Amino acid sequence: MEESRIAFLQRLINSPSPSGFEQRVQQVIREEMQLYTDEQRTDVHGNVIAALNPNANPRVMLTAHCDELGFLVRFIDEKGFIYFATIGGFDPSTLPGERVQIHTAKGSILGVIGRKPVHLLQSDERGKAPKLSEMWIDIGVNHKEEAQELVAIGSIATRAAQLEKLHGDLVVSRALDDKSGVFTVVEAMRRLHGQREKLKAGVFFVSAVQEEVGLRGAHTSAFGVDPLIAVAVDVTFTSDHPQTSKHEIGDIRLNGGPVISIGGRINPRVYQMLIDAADEAGIAYQIDPQASGTGTDTDVIQVSRAGVATGLLSIPCRYLHTGSEIVSLKDIDEIAELLSRFVLALDAQTNVIP
């Protein structure tokens, strides 16, 4: 992957966007989408919607969510220690010792999530996950007044982890769930823009907000866009590391290619068109059977208005909802290519009735 594109992914990661506070990353996305689309707008919830060939049919929505996990400052004690609420689904055991950035109007403040040292834990506390009430953020001050000069109640914070390269095609960062998905859909739009003379469908890009707290942005944006077809891009678990079971979650691997979901939330014709596009492009893929809900924006998009023909493409990801999520740039590139080829195959005669 070109370094300039990796740099754009880095910009997405560097723009904090806890659920409900996505404005900074959405500004980065708006600026990028002006290069590849004919129209751009932001709705009342903060979803960024950008259209390429907007008057054509069928209308297809390509979406990923831009929000990430985060923290919300709730209280500062007399010694300047900061207590917080979590935004999204954290495993509390991953938090003690984590460095965080508290984002303020004057800039970011570095802090550390503190907890009583292991040496001081009582016997009944050892081996148990810590409670949020037993943790705080330490920014290195001595008094409440010092902390208040730097941090306001209601400030947001994110883990301080940034994008770094691992071996081969792998990268590690916080918030790859789902900024890697946003990046993938932007890449697909960039490729479609470069081939717009072949494009017959109207394509609506959506960078959706508030997925981590209830799939909210996808719910409202799908109603507004009113697509016939929608494909969401998110991350999914892998079974290629210790303490996971292929029997429970299937055989999903990093560098194994796009993960294509099948199940009750997935339109069977859209599923087959994604398979066909992958086969024609020579892209290896992985199948993820979803017996009930997918836990992604697909679930609410499917039942928008009179119904939407939905598909779900997933990026294999290790260690979800930690500060060290791992994905493959190769998988991302292949999903972007698959998505663009899928869209180019759509026309006014496309039938999605099961």
List where the protein language model places each region.
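N-terminal hydrophobic/helix-forming segments and targeting peptides
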Residues: 1-354
